[in-house]
Amino acid sequence: MPPHGPNSQGGRRGGGHSSGRRGGRGGGGRGGGGGGRGEQRWWDPVWRAERLRQQQAEMEVLDENEWWNKIEQWKTGGEQEMLIKRNFSRGDQQTLSDMALQMGLYFHAYNKGKALVVSKVPLPDYRADLDERHGSTQKEIKMSTETERKLGSLLKTTQESGSSGASASAFNDQQDRTSTLGLKRPDSASKLPDSLEKEKFSFALKERQEKLKATESVKALKAFREKLPAFKMKEEFLNSVSQNQVLVVSGETGCGKTTQLPQFILEEEISSLRGADCNIICTQPRRISAISVASRISAERGESIGESVGYQIRLESKRSDQTRLLFCTTGVLLRRLIEDPNLTNVSHLLVDEIHERGMNEDFLLIILRDLLPRRPDLRLILMSATINADMFSTYFGNSPTMHIPGFTFPVAELFLEDVLEKSRYNIKSSDSGNYQGSSRGRRRESESKKDDLTTLFEDIDINSHYKSYSSATRNSLEAWSGAQIDVDLVEATIEHICRLEGGGAILVFLTGWDEISKLLEKINMNNFLGDSSKFLVLPLHGSMPTVNQREIFDRPPPNKRKIVLATNIAESSITIDDVVYVVDCGKAKETSYDALNKVACLLPSWISKASAHQRRGRAGRVQAGVCYRLYPKVIYDAFPQYQLPEIIRTPLQELCLHIKSLQVGSIGSFLAKALQPPDALAVENAIELLKTIGALNDVEELTPLGRHLCTLPVDPNIGKMLLIGAIFQCVNPALTIAAALAYRSPFVLPLNRKEEADEAKRYFAGDSCSDHIALLKAYEGYRDAKRGGNEKDFCWQNFLSPVTLRMMEDMRNQFLDLLSDIGFVDKSKPNAYNQYSYDMEMISAVLCAGLYPNVVQCKRRGKRTAFYTKELGKVDIHPGSVNARVNLFSLPYLVYSEKVKTTSVYIRDSTNISDYALLMFGGNLIPSKTGEGIEMLGGYLHFSASKNILELIQRLRGEVDKLLNKKIEDPSLDITVEGKGVVSAVVELLRSQKH
């Protein structure tokens, strides 16, 4: 038998000492350790020593040869895993782990080492089925005699309403997909009756274009256009487009590819009298890009936006029957493909920013590769800001490529060590009170927060590596932490530039809105930078209202410097012409998805070299610039060349729903055709979730509910909440909460008034134990204040963002329009859909319907509550939640919007719910094996009750499901008539369990 000493790889596979500890935390919870044997006295050294001796005596001894042979024999069989329930020491568990590793297997210890698993496939950190204490829960359902009598009476009077309604095919026949999606096809020329009319239209377009070219404003802008590198390649580009169905164009930032290439095609088609048949679509990954590029091209053509050039984004559109070139977000085009899979009448399609590898863009590329053989006349141009065109060219059958050189002035580059030396800024260690920094020794203790690049820097001998730098700089490098961005350092760098460097705008790259708002607050409080007569400070975030975003393109008055605080949206999606200085923090907020443990991880992560190159290039647009990189060069040198594509690092349920709506076969086979296919387990998880919420049936086909969810541009769970809210006459709360979850929370947390802000949020939540109710009440308060004209004061006093609330208002209106389009609400009768909009029990039940299977068990532990999920075992409430300070909950469960792994696994935006809400609106109720109860979530939740109560619950749930199915298959069904008895019974049941 080969040797198998301790091996660090065993730990990575889930084995060894770390595995045993992980299994212990996940399986048995924290604390205790006495095996449940009487009083625990671990604080008593005598008792502790005796208990440890007892545990040691109870340990079995591992016979290595015996277990090697057992595992080898099992490996040749057909079973996927071997479960070992033996009391081995941690050292023996490590030995088993090493054996498994050498055999190419996986190992994990669960339930404090009492359940050891050797597996042929990777193992998750937690297994509910192996957790004796928290793996499942048995809950007895009780009901008062009065409630039992009322429910029985209401059910008795409920008239049976026949079969479950129209078939799926009938559903398809009933729906007008164009009206459902609320999209207008950008092919208005197809309305023209005959070729003569088209010819007249083409002549008119050409005549107008020639007249505009002769105007002084267009001539002046043409002189600017001709200086762009893209202009020099105009003829080569147009020839390539005419001769090839697919062309891949890479171009450095500032070369003009985004504004000029679509315009070249438009000008050529109109000049060649093909304007009537010309229908160009150019996709952009972000709303602001679609608007800004369309505006720029309109100006260069001497037109107003919405004439020959327009845009369409969610909630906003500027276009007309004259529009021949339409800029839209990738999501808008994907929804167009649902109603028009062949992109009828589209002549040219340009997909910009493909280098970003967003999920929508990768999804679109799969569709387009399948579409091209059916549309040989369609011309596809893929545009990338980085020189990685070969990968895209290969994907599209070795299509030709073209590179446009950049047009930038020289940009000096300063890394952290140079910035510190030049600015003489001192980074303080944590001992000095600056929470952003920390000594290298103390940082090494916080292993959980480390990444590989930070570890790489910590292993460097600072005094040796940076011996040419001053001692002050070396001390600062010792204190610097890569774990989080030092906002004080960013502020100091901006101040250094403004005091000592020449004029020009400053562009600062941060990871998200929290850092932008913190830095904005610091700048406003800074005695020098806070002077608004000298400095114009503008935040730039992808989710900001478009009106606010447009300000960043305007040049400030003389003697006033513009400072833009941005996320990675400013890397390549937009161009701010007057930037001379870039301050790069080196990170971007990026979601990764742990498919094995079914949890999203949201942490700022280091960017790629390609992104760093893009950021640097923003500084050389108008003159020689400087890029201040606030991280060491050794970290930059270790950056990956490109970021991971989004499709392989995020949950896929919304994408999978879109795939089914396109009717392109199975989800797995479709995604296997991606440029870089996602992990098969991530795909399985998404399909499983869609089946759990009822969007897909057992054979992976869309259900009637799934078809409706496809029409709502939100996560499937949020879409389901909207539909259930409309059906159960609770539509206003559903609209508000859905808008907040789909966009962002309106609550802001100022750094120096965090406690007051938390208190304001708790005030809105009241005694509901619900973040969702807090969102709802905050919006309702804003709406009331707006009616009185004092919404600004209301937002200021309650720490709310008026910008976010206005966007929520717009999204509510959009969701209401969509619900109206598919027949779920009649906007002329709002009261009919809001009978229960102020009933907290019904609102909680609607939340349960939408958020299931995101369920947490609340288990009392003395004077506090511990929280457990099926996938991960013990979790924590996010500190920003109103429930973070609640010690004891009166109801046994929480439903939550998302769980995210940062420093710990947190659940965000949670609501305390009752047994009855879960039983009526959760997943399928499965009779237990004994026949004395019912189960949910694959047996994770068990409910027992008397025979009469069980039968009553199952009867009512059956009526609820029947009513939901009828309404979903026939949205015109009047619930107030057809389902009055069922709804009344549900309300009665929910109200009976008030806390």
UniProtKB/Swiss-Prot annotation:
Checking SMART domains in the record gives:
DEXDc (SM00487), HA2 (SM00847), HELICc (SM00490)
Task: Tell me which InterPro entries the record gives.
Answer: DEAD-box_helicase_OB_fold, DEAD/DEAH_box_helicase_dom, DNA/RNA_helicase_DEAH_CS, HA2_WH, Helicase-assoc_dom, Helicase_ATP-bd, Helicase_C-like, P-loop_NTPase
Catalytic function, reaction form: ATP + H2O = ADP + phosphate + H(+)
Concerning PROSITE patterns, the annotation shows: DEAH_ATP_HELICASE (PS00690), HELICASE_ATP_BIND_1 (PS51192), HELICASE_CTER (PS51194)
Q: What's one GO MF term for it?
A: RNA helicase activity
What SUPFAM superfamilies does the record point to?
P-loop containing nucleoside triphosphate hydrolases
UniProt: ATP binding residues:
251-258
Enzyme class, top EC level, equals hydrolase
- Which portions of the sequence form the region Disordered? 1-42, 156-192, 429-450
Start-end of Low complexity biased regions: 161-170
EC numbers for this chain? 3.6.4.13
Q: Where is the composition biased (Gly residues)?
A: 25-37
Enumerate composition-biased segments (Polar residues).
171-181
User: Taking every annotated instance into account, which residue ranges of this chain make up the domain Helicase ATP-binding?
Assistant: 238-405
Q: Which family does it belong to?
A: Belongs to the DExH box helicase family.
What is the name of this protein? DExH-box ATP-dependent RNA helicase DExH1
Question: What lineage, starting at the top, does this entry show?
Answer: Eukaryota, Viridiplantae, Streptophyta, Embryophyta, Tracheophyta
